[in-house]
Protein backbone atom coordinates (compact mmCIF):
# COMPACT_ATOMS: atom_id res chain seq x y z
CA UNK A 1 0.00 0.00 0.00
CA UNK A 2 2.86 2.35 0.82
CA UNK A 3 4.29 1.70 -2.63
CA UNK A 4 0.94 2.48 -4.25
CA UNK A 5 0.63 5.76 -2.32
CA UNK A 6 4.11 6.88 -3.31
CA UNK A 7 3.43 6.03 -6.96
CA UNK A 8 0.22 8.06 -6.98
CA UNK A 9 1.97 10.97 -5.26
CA UNK A 10 4.75 10.86 -7.86
CA UNK A 11 2.17 10.97 -10.66
CA UNK A 12 0.49 14.00 -9.06
CA UNK A 13 3.80 15.86 -8.79
CA UNK A 14 4.73 14.97 -12.39
CA UNK A 15 1.35 16.08 -13.75
CA UNK A 16 1.54 19.35 -11.80
CA UNK A 17 4.91 20.08 -13.41
CA UNK A 18 3.48 19.31 -16.85
CA UNK A 19 0.52 21.59 -16.12
CA UNK A 20 2.86 24.47 -15.26
CA UNK A 21 4.75 23.95 -18.54
CA UNK A 22 1.61 23.86 -20.70
CA UNK A 23 0.21 26.90 -18.88
CA UNK A 24 3.40 28.83 -19.60
CA UNK A 25 3.31 27.73 -23.25
CA UNK A 26 -0.29 28.92 -23.50
CA UNK A 27 0.73 32.35 -22.24
CA UNK A 28 3.59 32.51 -24.75
CA UNK A 29 1.27 31.54 -27.62
CA UNK A 30 -1.25 34.11 -26.44
CA UNK A 31 1.37 36.87 -26.56
CA UNK A 32 2.46 35.75 -30.03
CA UNK A 33 -1.17 35.73 -31.17
CA UNK A 34 -1.68 39.34 -30.09
CA UNK A 35 1.42 40.42 -32.04
CA UNK A 36 0.37 38.45 -35.13
CA UNK A 37 -3.13 39.91 -35.10
CA UNK A 38 -1.66 43.42 -34.93
CA UNK A 39 0.78 42.62 -37.76
CA UNK A 40 -2.12 41.35 -39.87
CA UNK A 41 -4.10 44.54 -39.26
CA UNK A 42 -1.10 46.70 -40.13
CA UNK A 43 -0.44 44.76 -43.33
CA UNK A 44 -4.05 45.09 -44.44
CA UNK A 45 -3.57 48.86 -44.76
CA UNK A 46 -0.93 48.29 -47.45
CA UNK A 47 -2.74 45.32 -48.99
CA UNK A 48 -6.04 47.18 -49.40
CA UNK A 49 -4.31 50.13 -51.11
CA UNK A 50 -2.37 48.05 -53.61
CA UNK A 51 -5.49 45.99 -54.31
CA UNK A 52 -7.50 49.15 -54.97
CA UNK A 53 -4.88 50.54 -57.35
CA UNK A 54 -4.49 47.22 -59.15
CA UNK A 55 -8.19 46.52 -59.57
CA UNK A 56 -8.95 50.07 -60.70
CA UNK A 57 -6.20 49.84 -63.28
CA UNK A 58 -7.34 46.42 -64.46
CA UNK A 59 -10.94 47.61 -64.82
CA UNK A 60 -10.01 50.68 -66.82
CA UNK A 61 -10.16 50.65 -70.59
CA UNK A 62 -6.44 51.31 -70.63
CA UNK A 63 -5.73 47.66 -69.83
CA UNK A 64 -7.84 46.18 -72.63
CA UNK A 65 -5.92 43.60 -74.56
CA UNK A 66 -3.05 43.33 -72.10
CA UNK A 67 -0.67 40.48 -72.85
CA UNK A 68 0.90 40.43 -69.38
CA UNK A 69 1.49 36.71 -68.57
CA UNK A 70 0.09 37.14 -65.06
CA UNK A 71 -3.29 38.09 -66.55
CA UNK A 72 -3.51 35.36 -69.18
CA UNK A 73 -5.43 32.16 -68.51
CA UNK A 74 -3.93 29.22 -70.39
CA UNK A 75 -4.77 25.51 -70.57
CA UNK A 76 -3.86 23.93 -67.25
CA UNK A 77 -1.27 21.20 -67.67
CA UNK A 78 0.37 21.59 -64.27
CA UNK A 79 -0.72 23.28 -61.02
CA UNK A 80 1.41 24.84 -58.31
CA UNK A 81 0.44 24.73 -54.63
CA UNK A 82 2.00 26.84 -51.90
CA UNK A 83 1.21 24.85 -48.74
CA UNK A 84 1.69 26.58 -45.37
CA UNK A 85 2.16 24.46 -42.23
CA UNK A 86 3.98 24.96 -38.93
CA UNK A 87 7.58 24.07 -38.11
CA UNK A 88 6.66 22.44 -34.79
CA UNK A 89 3.86 20.41 -33.28
CA UNK A 90 1.72 21.12 -30.21
CA UNK A 91 -0.80 23.05 -32.33
CA UNK A 92 -3.76 20.67 -32.20
CA UNK A 93 -5.27 19.84 -35.59
CA UNK A 94 -3.70 22.86 -37.32
CA UNK A 95 -1.44 20.83 -39.63
CA UNK A 96 -3.62 17.76 -40.11
CA UNK A 97 -6.50 19.83 -41.50
CA UNK A 98 -4.48 21.53 -44.22
CA UNK A 99 -2.51 18.41 -45.13
CA UNK A 100 -5.69 16.35 -45.47
CA UNK A 101 -7.23 19.01 -47.70
CA UNK A 102 -4.26 19.25 -50.06
CA UNK A 103 -3.91 15.45 -50.24
CA UNK A 104 -7.60 15.09 -51.11
CA UNK A 105 -7.23 17.69 -53.89
CA UNK A 106 -4.12 16.10 -55.37
CA UNK A 107 -5.58 12.59 -55.29
CA UNK A 108 -8.82 13.76 -56.90
CA UNK A 109 -7.54 16.13 -59.57
CA UNK A 110 -3.92 15.30 -60.37
CA UNK A 111 -1.72 12.59 -61.77
CA UNK A 112 1.79 12.05 -60.43
CA UNK A 113 3.55 14.64 -62.60
CA UNK A 114 1.06 17.46 -63.09
CA UNK A 115 1.51 19.39 -59.85
CA UNK A 116 4.30 21.10 -57.90
CA UNK A 117 4.36 21.86 -54.18
CA UNK A 118 6.07 24.86 -52.63
CA UNK A 119 6.19 23.97 -48.94
CA UNK A 120 6.42 26.55 -46.15
CA UNK A 121 6.91 24.85 -42.78
CA UNK A 122 8.86 21.78 -41.66
CA UNK A 123 5.79 19.67 -40.88
CA UNK A 124 4.53 19.93 -44.45
CA UNK A 125 7.97 19.48 -46.00
CA UNK A 126 8.62 16.28 -44.04
CA UNK A 127 5.11 15.02 -44.78
CA UNK A 128 5.39 15.46 -48.55
CA UNK A 129 8.95 14.16 -48.83
CA UNK A 130 8.10 11.05 -46.83
CA UNK A 131 5.48 10.27 -49.48
CA UNK A 132 7.73 10.99 -52.45
CA UNK A 133 5.65 13.94 -53.65
CA UNK A 134 6.82 16.74 -55.96
CA UNK A 135 8.32 19.49 -53.77
CA UNK A 136 9.87 22.24 -55.90
CA UNK A 137 10.96 24.52 -53.03
CA UNK A 138 10.70 24.54 -49.27
CA UNK A 139 11.15 27.05 -46.47
CA UNK A 140 11.77 25.94 -42.90
CA UNK A 141 12.24 27.85 -39.67
CA UNK A 142 9.69 30.59 -40.30
CA UNK A 143 9.80 33.30 -37.64
CA UNK A 144 6.89 33.85 -35.27
CA UNK A 145 6.35 37.22 -36.96
CA UNK A 146 7.65 36.57 -40.51
CA UNK A 147 9.04 39.53 -42.42
CA UNK A 148 8.80 39.83 -46.18
CA UNK A 149 12.59 39.57 -46.37
CA UNK A 150 12.35 36.05 -44.92
CA UNK A 151 9.69 34.79 -47.31
CA UNK A 152 10.25 37.07 -50.31
CA UNK A 153 12.53 34.68 -52.17
CA UNK A 154 10.23 31.67 -52.12
CA UNK A 155 7.27 33.90 -53.05
CA UNK A 156 9.19 35.36 -56.01
CA UNK A 157 10.28 31.87 -57.10
CA UNK A 158 6.65 30.74 -57.07
CA UNK A 159 5.53 33.70 -59.20
CA UNK A 160 8.44 33.20 -61.62
CA UNK A 161 7.50 29.54 -62.08
CA UNK A 162 4.05 30.64 -63.23
CA UNK A 163 5.39 33.38 -65.50
CA UNK A 164 7.87 30.91 -67.03
CA UNK A 165 5.01 28.40 -67.57
CA UNK A 166 6.47 25.72 -65.32
CA UNK A 167 2.92 25.50 -64.02
CA UNK A 168 -0.24 27.17 -65.33
CA UNK A 169 -2.02 28.20 -62.14
CA UNK A 170 -0.95 28.85 -58.57
CA UNK A 171 -2.89 28.21 -55.37
CA UNK A 172 -2.11 29.00 -51.74
CA UNK A 173 -3.34 26.45 -49.19
CA UNK A 174 -3.42 27.59 -45.58
CA UNK A 175 -5.45 27.92 -42.38
CA UNK A 176 -7.34 31.22 -42.25
CA UNK A 177 -7.55 32.77 -38.78
CA UNK A 178 -11.17 33.41 -37.76
CA UNK A 179 -10.76 33.86 -34.01
CA UNK A 180 -8.78 32.38 -31.13
CA UNK A 181 -10.86 29.19 -31.23
CA UNK A 182 -11.54 28.76 -34.94
CA UNK A 183 -9.62 28.55 -38.20
CA UNK A 184 -10.77 27.58 -41.69
CA UNK A 185 -8.87 25.81 -44.45
CA UNK A 186 -8.53 28.04 -47.51
CA UNK A 187 -7.39 27.04 -50.98
CA UNK A 188 -7.10 30.34 -52.83
CA UNK A 189 -6.09 30.80 -56.45
CA UNK A 190 -3.46 33.52 -56.83
CA UNK A 191 -2.47 33.21 -60.50
CA UNK A 192 -3.54 34.03 -63.08
CA UNK A 193 -5.08 37.27 -61.83
CA UNK A 194 -8.02 36.89 -64.22
CA UNK A 195 -10.17 35.85 -61.24
CA UNK A 196 -9.61 39.26 -59.67
CA UNK A 197 -10.64 41.02 -62.88
CA UNK A 198 -13.88 39.02 -62.97
CA UNK A 199 -14.66 39.72 -59.31
CA UNK A 200 -14.18 43.45 -59.66
CA UNK A 201 -15.63 43.93 -63.14
CA UNK A 202 -19.18 44.57 -61.94
CA UNK A 203 -18.19 47.22 -59.41
CA UNK A 204 -18.29 50.91 -60.20
CA UNK A 205 -16.12 53.79 -59.15
CA UNK A 206 -12.90 53.45 -61.11
CA UNK A 207 -10.25 55.90 -59.98
CA UNK A 208 -8.73 57.97 -62.80
CA UNK A 209 -5.03 57.56 -63.55
CA UNK A 210 -2.48 59.54 -65.50
CA UNK A 211 -0.04 56.81 -66.44
CA UNK A 212 3.68 57.46 -66.78
CA UNK A 213 5.70 56.12 -68.48
CA UNK A 214 3.00 53.78 -69.89
CA UNK A 215 0.51 51.05 -69.03
CA UNK A 216 2.78 48.14 -69.98
CA UNK A 217 5.67 49.24 -67.74
CA UNK A 218 3.35 49.92 -64.80
CA UNK A 219 1.71 46.50 -65.04
CA UNK A 220 5.08 44.79 -65.33
CA UNK A 221 6.05 46.27 -61.96
CA UNK A 222 2.69 46.36 -60.20
CA UNK A 223 1.28 42.89 -60.85
CA UNK A 224 4.20 40.94 -59.31
CA UNK A 225 4.10 43.20 -56.24
CA UNK A 226 0.34 42.74 -55.96
CA UNK A 227 0.52 38.94 -56.23
CA UNK A 228 3.41 38.77 -53.77
CA UNK A 229 1.42 40.88 -51.31
CA UNK A 230 -1.51 38.44 -51.52
CA UNK A 231 0.76 35.47 -50.82
CA UNK A 232 2.55 37.27 -47.99
CA UNK A 233 -0.83 38.18 -46.49
CA UNK A 234 -1.80 34.50 -46.54
CA UNK A 235 1.44 33.62 -44.71
CA UNK A 236 0.71 36.20 -41.99
CA UNK A 237 -2.86 34.91 -41.73
CA UNK A 238 -1.65 31.31 -41.43
CA UNK A 239 0.91 32.23 -38.77
CA UNK A 240 -1.81 33.96 -36.76
CA UNK A 241 -3.97 30.84 -36.99
CA UNK A 242 -0.98 28.75 -35.87
CA UNK A 243 -0.48 30.83 -32.71
CA UNK A 244 -4.21 30.62 -31.95
CA UNK A 245 -4.12 26.84 -32.41
CA UNK A 246 -1.09 26.57 -30.13
CA UNK A 247 -2.79 28.64 -27.44
CA UNK A 248 -5.95 26.54 -27.63
CA UNK A 249 -4.01 23.26 -27.59
CA UNK A 250 -2.01 24.29 -24.52
CA UNK A 251 -5.16 25.49 -22.75
CA UNK A 252 -6.77 22.12 -23.43
CA UNK A 253 -3.66 20.32 -22.18
CA UNK A 254 -3.63 22.43 -19.00
CA UNK A 255 -7.31 21.74 -18.36
CA UNK A 256 -6.80 18.01 -18.92
CA UNK A 257 -3.85 18.02 -16.52
CA UNK A 258 -6.02 19.63 -13.85
CA UNK A 259 -8.64 16.92 -14.30
CA UNK A 260 -5.97 14.23 -14.03
CA UNK A 261 -4.57 15.84 -10.86
CA UNK A 262 -8.05 15.97 -9.35
CA UNK A 263 -8.69 12.29 -10.15
CA UNK A 264 -5.27 11.26 -8.81
CA UNK A 265 -5.83 13.28 -5.62
CA UNK A 266 -9.14 11.49 -5.00
CA UNK A 267 -7.44 8.17 -5.70
CA UNK A 268 -4.59 9.08 -3.33
CA UNK A 269 -6.96 10.08 -0.52
CA UNK A 270 -8.97 6.88 -0.88
CA UNK A 271 -5.82 4.75 -0.84
CA UNK A 272 -4.50 6.64 2.18
CA UNK A 273 -7.81 6.23 4.00
CA UNK A 274 -7.80 2.50 3.22
CA UNK A 275 -4.23 2.20 4.53
CA UNK A 276 -5.13 3.99 7.78
CA UNK A 277 -8.24 1.84 8.21
CA UNK A 278 -6.17 -1.30 7.70
CA UNK A 279 -3.59 -0.17 10.27
CA UNK A 280 -6.30 0.56 12.85
CA UNK A 281 -7.89 -2.81 12.20
CA UNK A 282 -4.54 -4.56 12.70
CA UNK A 283 -3.88 -2.67 15.95
CA UNK A 284 -7.32 -3.52 17.34
CA UNK A 285 -6.92 -7.16 16.32
CA UNK A 286 -3.53 -7.30 18.00
CA UNK A 287 -4.87 -5.76 21.20
CA UNK A 288 -7.75 -8.24 21.30
CA UNK A 289 -5.31 -11.09 20.86
CA UNK A 290 -3.35 -10.00 23.94
CA UNK A 291 -6.42 -10.05 26.18
UniProtKB/Swiss-Prot annotation:
One of its GO terms (molecular function) is proton-transporting ATP synthase activity, rotational mechanism. It is found in: Cell membrane. CDD domains: F1-ATPase_gamma (cd12151). Keywords: ATP synthesis, Cell membrane, CF(1), Hydrogen ion transport, Ion transport, Membrane, Transport. SUPFAM superfamilies: ATP synthase (F1-ATPase), gamma subunit. One of its GO terms (cellular component) is plasma membrane. It holds the Pfam family ATP-synt. F-type ATPases have 2 components, CF(1) - the catalytic core - and CF(0) - the membrane proton channel. CF(1) has five subunits: alpha(3), beta(3), gamma(1), delta(1), epsilon(1). CF(0) has three main subunits: a, b and c. This is ATP synthase gamma chain. The lineage of its organism: Bacteria, Bacillati, Bacillota, Bacilli, Lactobacillales.
Amino acid sequence: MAGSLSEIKAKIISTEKTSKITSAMRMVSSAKLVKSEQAARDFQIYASKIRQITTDLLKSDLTTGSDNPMLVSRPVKKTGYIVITSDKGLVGGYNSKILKSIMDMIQEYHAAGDYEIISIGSIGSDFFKARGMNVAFELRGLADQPSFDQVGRIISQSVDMFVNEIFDELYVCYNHHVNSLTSQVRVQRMLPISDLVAEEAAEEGVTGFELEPNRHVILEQLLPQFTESLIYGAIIDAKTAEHAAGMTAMQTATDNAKHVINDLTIQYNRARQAAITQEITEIVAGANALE
